[in-house]
Amino acid sequence: MTSFFDSESPSNVAEYSVSELSGSIKRTIEQTFEHVRVRGEISGYRGPHSSGHAYFTLKDDRARIDAVVWKGTFARLKFRPEEGMEVIATGRVTTFPGSSKYQVVIDALEPAGAGALMALIEERKRKLAAEGLFDAGRKRPLPFMPKVIGVVTSPTGAVIRDILHRIADRFPVHVLVWPVRVQGDGACEEIVAAIEGFNALQPGGPIARPDVLIVARGGGSLEDLWCFNDEAMVRAAAGSAIPLISAVGHETDWTLIDHAADQRAPTPTGAAEMAVPVKADLEAQLASLSARLKGAAVRQMDNRRQTLRSLARALPSLDQLLALPRRRFDEAAAGLGRGLQMNTANKRRSFERSAAHLRPDLLTARIVDRRQRVVDAVNRAERIVERQVHRGAARVASADASLRALPSRLIGQVHRASDRVSAMSRRADAAIAADLRRLKSAVAAQDRVLQSLSYRNVLQRGFALVRDAAGEPVKQAAAVHSGMALSVEFADGRVAAVAGEDGTPSQAPKKRPARAGEPTKQGSLF
């Protein structure tokens, strides 16, 4: 009986282990596909990693294959791989026996024709334009005369020499060069860092902040200029706070940074011409404008001088304008002085007449003090009026001098001088009237005081004043002796009398009793 698993006939097929078969497949594939060119679209792009390698997948509409670009190869690429880019990869196929996978190890990478790159550029252009990065409204004008220009380009080559030479020829200014790579691995990052670095400079800092930036590169193929189509660079150019000029390639070469920049120059030399004007042209324009301005000023001065002469001839003479104000001022000054003197003299005479009736032994000190105050007040009033008169005369003299010097302001100054004289006259009249009222009130008050203290008021109440032969009042009975001539003064006159012997009357006169409620006619001395 035969086993179910026994082979019915011996096999001629060789038997391999898994490792042997995987190794055989690896050798076969790598020998067969040692050098291949694969056309496909980049998908799942990852890289470069921290190791420097880049991983992605090449695909078409029916299949896909993994690919890897090692660090050394990636640094030699002319452009950076991007998601969705159609490329032609040159390399070799290798497998991994441990996982039964294969991939293409890429030695060279190039775009699959200009059409593929242009399609990618157009797609990116539409995306960035939709975000408003290319809007004309956000573009700023270039400064007319920048003091500092920042240049982002390679430090070697003809580009930087052309820019520096052109700026020196047209209008020499301070130039700051930020050296960068303009092609190959790391070029995009360096240019973005340069743009952001210039914008990070602070005004007034140790390094001058540029007034305008130039990002420049010479001509080249689409692959050579590819980094200037990078999205990060376009965003850096659009976000620059400093006006930026792009000068990449030749006039026919357009990159996305040209659309984001504030100005696009066809060549680096053209960028230098945009950045600075021609100094000689500015000097010529300045000289022409200066000559025109000087001529216009001379003509204007001649016209104004002629107009002034015509107006001066039409004005009346200075003496005619000043005659009436001078006469009014003289009359006012003369009348003011005379009136003040007359009023002062009248008040002084009135005061002296009033003072003549006053007893020198009553309130002498107060009267003298009041008189001195009145005299001081009169003197002050005279000085005030005199100063005002002199001040008015000085002002009129000043106005006269000003009118002679400035005939165009003659009429206004005459009116103001007349108003000031009138105001001074009114103030002087008011001051004199106030002083006279104050003096009159003072004299009336003193008169009332004298009247209230006069002994005649006592005589009116029935008392009598006894005087001796010398006319002095007799104040005590002991001062009277028999036979002494006396003068008794009553309210209505005086009576001569002779003192009799000392003694008391034998019978005192009887006093008529006063009726109840009847007021006595005899007042009290106190």
From Swiss-Prot:
EC annotation from Swiss-Prot or TrEMBL = 3.1.11.6
Bilayer-crossing residues are none
> Which is a Gene Ontology cellular component entry for this protein?
exodeoxyribonuclease VII complex
Q: CDD domains annotated for this entry?
A: ExoVII_LU_OBF (cd04489)
Q: Where is this region: Disordered?
A: 499-526
- From the UniProt record, give one GO term of the biological process aspect: DNA catabolic process
> Catalysed reaction(s)?
Exonucleolytic cleavage in either 5'- to 3'- or 3'- to 5'-direction to yield nucleoside 5'-phosphates
The domain of life for this entry's organism is: Bacteria
Keyword annotations for this protein? Cytoplasm, Exonuclease, Hydrolase, Nuclease
Q: Where in the cell is it found?
A: Cytoplasm
Enzyme class, broadest EC rank: hydrolase
Q: Name one GO molecular function term.
A: exodeoxyribonuclease VII activity
Tell me how this protein assembles: Heterooligomer composed of large and small subunits.
Family label: Belongs to the XseA family.
Cited function: Bidirectionally degrades single-stranded DNA into large acid-insoluble oligonucleotides, which are then degraded further into small acid-soluble oligonucleotides.
What this protein is called in its record is: Exodeoxyribonuclease 7 large subunit
